[in-house]
Amino acid sequence: MFKVGIIFLLTYSYTAALIINGYVDMHFGNLAHAYQDYGVAYCFTSSIKDRGIGKSKEYSQEYRDNLKLDLDETSIEVSEKTPNIIFVQLESFFDPKLVKGVEFSYNPTPNFDRLREEYSSGYLSVPCFGAGTANTEFEVQTGVNLDDFGPGEYPYRTVMQSKTCESAAYDLKKIGYSTHAIHNNDATFYDRYKVFSHLGYDTFTPIEYMSSDYQKTPLGWAKDKMLVPEIRKTLDSTENMDYIFTISVQGHGDYPAVMPEGYIPSVKVSGFFAEDEQTQFEYYVNQIHEMDSFIGELVNMLERRREETVLVMYGDHLPTFSFTNDTMENADIYQTEYFIWSNFDMEKIDMNLQAYQLSAAVFERLGISEGYIMKFHQTKHKDEDYLKKLKILEYDILYGDKQIYNGEVPYVATDLKMGIEDITIDQVYNYKDYICISGNNFNDFSKVLINDKEVDCEIISGNLIKVPKKNVVSKDEVSVVQSGEDKIELGRTTYKVE
């Protein structure tokens, strides 16, 4: 054991020296692949040695004052237009026709192709490959460059656990928007149920607060078409304009090496460069074909509404296959694509963007310039020292003296409401040898507690739950709790029996 400890310390010291002197790669687009390529010792060392954003030599009072003054005196043309703004991050979505040599029985992404051609679009450079959804969404929401963090770091699991950060949601709240997040997967994944209050959201609707009437893929992921009614419901929940950040899940890996029993793919695929991944890729293509149908359904729903709306859709990263730059027509495995749709006239302007530039670019098109990071991207992206200044600004906001805000962070964590529709209990009564709980918006993630002890229950409908072989008595407290498989309580409604 002593020898193992000595070996570890020597390895740690050696790899730390390599990191400090810049002899090894510091960018982990896929942490699992990094462990394979560089080994446990290097990845572990770099992950604990280099976390957060490093302090630049230029980080001085004078430099910060000049940067603040420059941004305060810089502006873009502001508009009075305040449409609904909806971002949809599509899990592992990209155009599979970009893979060299692959043939399809028919086009798997006709809706995405049409919208990309008719509306503003371009390539989107993302910080991850094959995994790391939360890092792409962090860049998109905050405008912060993940390259400035430690290798393999997830800010959701480090700095965002305890701090607020300037974000698109906070910026839009300043001008009267209601802010919402939606995700058709577990609320606790990447700690979103904690982090979203630090990013300025009023509500968060994870799958634990959605209707149980949804379909799953053969591997158990929720299908994305369930997001259409959830987005519509969210838009209907307020009378003012809404900002909705939506994270989809259907395209999530891993993908099966053998087609699931009874599953018949509608799109046939041939010519994939890695023969041992051919079946997996065909399965994946059929999932994004269904996601493409969801894109069409969402646009159709928004077209029918009378409210002016902007919809931004993009892929978070490429799926986990043996892609290299050489296998791709666009020669970059860290690129997905985006488009900006609207139900009112917007000039088509195509440009390639970094994920951390996307929100600022959309807001600039709408004449919205709130927040220092967004304004910085809108006005300084052509500067020679753009990335250096961005890193200094990020450090000041998250780790430094907050000089850009005159020393005091203006963003307070929100009282995050789980779900759009309240889960209520109207009545609890005995019927024969079971308890009936009537109310609203129960689903498959609803659990029943009697006097704080969980009991078996049967979800009959969104309005009725049965508890078998039990009766309640006066002063019993009956609670309906929402939680996923990890048993973390997300919300509770309690009824006291008279």
Where are these predicted regions, by residue range?
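N-terminal secretory/membrane-targeting segments
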Residues: 1-83, 104-123, 158-162, 166, ...
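Solvent-exposed soluble domains appended to multi-pass membrane proteins
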Residues: 74-80, 90, 95-467, 471-498
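Long, solvent-exposed extracytoplasmic domains/loops
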Residues: 85-89
